[in-house]
Regions:
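Glycine-rich phosphate-binding "P-loop"
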Residues: 104-109, 157-173
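Active-site-proximal binding-pocket segments
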Residues: 167, 186, 195-198, 202-205, ...
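Metal-dependent catalytic neighborhoods of phosphoester/phosphodiester hydrolases
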Residues: 145-146, 169-176, 205-207
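Acidic, His- and aromatic-enriched active-site or binding-groove loops in soluble protein domains
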Residues: 154-164, 211-227, 235-237
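An active-site-proximal "capping" alpha-helix that borders the catalytic cofactor pocket
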Residues: 175-189
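Conserved beta-strand positions
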Residues: 159, 196, 282-284
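Short, solvent-exposed turn/loop segments enriched in Gly/Ser/Thr/Pro and often Arg
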Residues: 135-143, 192-202, 218-221
Length: 370
């Protein structure tokens, strides 16, 4: 991570002092406002925010912020100029020659979501896919049998905080008070992953959670109580913590706030990420995916993702483990060109960058020799 990258990956560009003071007030007031009124206010605000983003090109753009992708392409272009027309070997982003990766995640916010776990698992079984489930540890009773059902389906159990109240990062004292219990639940559940309630985040503190990876940073998200985004469609490190950005708009954002009627925006964004070799991270809440229409949206998305060629479907914990392996390989290689045989032993692959008709083209090893 370069200092320039960190400015975006850690959201240093976001001015947050005022919003941090207001977040606890927002969550306290929320309890006394009828849900219908809440949703009306949030939908009105989301429509206005969307309009301003589209009209003014506000940063980060939504649903696609291409800044770091473009920066990566500029660096590649400079290397290609120095190579004088020769293609450049690269360490591939994904194992075994896959061109992109995709992973499925669910935040279980309350009892309704807990009761809906099996319905979403059944949809996933039909498509032969697996997912990660993040549970709130102390807001609702969690039958250990539910965690076993998730694990038996080949899925992953993660932690979604202690309470879904937006207060984890309200102060350093409060954060430190919760750390021992957060770490205990991670150990007891055998969980490697954490996602902060309401995706509230603090890049400086999150490495202390005790998780192997976090998935709380959206790449771009102007519609929440903590707007912003890391602008990345690739994993990255916060200290020793692997960050897996949420790169598709949440189902709640699309269908609850913006009241979209189909999955075309999901498809557009997923296709763009795949073309640029990124990580497609899906977040669907079982608390909201209850009606047949919402379940059908999820089924359509799975069919679309399964049909994309060249993708690596994996659990988030496996993506995070791979990113550690890849980082170690990158350190070992230094400036040396990657050797295909050595990479293959580590499950990695070599990519090639070339410039054709003024555009940068990335090819996997097999396509480069085809």
């Amino acid at each position: 991570m370069t200092p320039d990258d960190a400015f975006y990956l850690e959201e240093r560009y976001v001015r947050r002092p005022r919003s941090r003071r207001l977040l606890p007030l927002f969550y306290r007031a929320k309890r006394f406002i009828p849900r219908r009124t809440q949703m009306h206010l949030r939908r009105t605000m989301a429509r206005r925010q969307r309009g301003r983003h589209e009209a003014q090109g506000r940063f980060p753009r939504w649903p696609i912020e291409p800044l770091l992708v473009h920066q990566r392409e500029i660096l590649l272009h400079q290397r290609l100029l120095r190579a004088e027309g020769r293609r450049i070997p690269l360490l591939g982003a994904w194992p075994r020659g896959h061109r992109f990766a995709w992973t499925l995640t669910h935040d279980v916010e309350g009892p309704k979501g807990l009761a809906n776990v099996e319905r979403l698992l059944e949809i996933e079984r039909r498509h032969g896919v697996v997912s990660a489930w993040y549970f709130v540890a102390e807001d609702y009773a969690i039958d250990p049998a539910v965690l076993e059902v998730v694990r038996a389906a080949g899925c992953e159990v993660g932690l979604h905080g202690l309470h879904h109240n937006g207060q984890l990062f309200q102060s350093r004292t409060h954060f430190e008070r919760q750390l021992p219990r957060i770490r205990r639940y991670l150990r007891e559940w055998g969980a490697e992953g954490f996602r902060s309630p309401s995706t509230h985040r603090n890049a400086a503190w999150m490495p202390e959670l005790g998780a192997r990876y976090d998935s709380s940073f959206p790449d771009t998200h102007p519609f929440d109580a903590q707007p912003g985004g890391c602008c990345s469609i690739l994993p990255y490190f916060l200290g020793d913590l692997v960050e897996l950005p949420i790169t598709l708009p949440q189902d709640h954002t699309l269908f609850e706030l913006l009241q979209e009627r189909d999955i075309s925006l999901w498809q557009e964004k997923a296709g763009w990420i795949a073309r640029h070799g990124g990580l497609i991270t899906v977040l669907v809440h079982p608390d909201y995916a209850i009606e047949d229409e919402r379940l059908d949206h999820y089924e359509q998305l799975l069919a679309f993702l399964c049909a994309l060629k060249g993708g690596w479907h994996a659990l988030p914990r496996d993506v995070a483990r791979w990113w550690r392996v890849r980082a170690a390989l990158e350190t070992q290689l230094g400036d040396a060109p990657p050797d295909a045989t050595a990479l293959a032993r580590a499950g990695a692959a070599r990519w090639f960058a070339a410039e054709r008709d003024g555009e940068i083209v990335i090819e996997t090893e097999e396509h480069a020799h085809a």
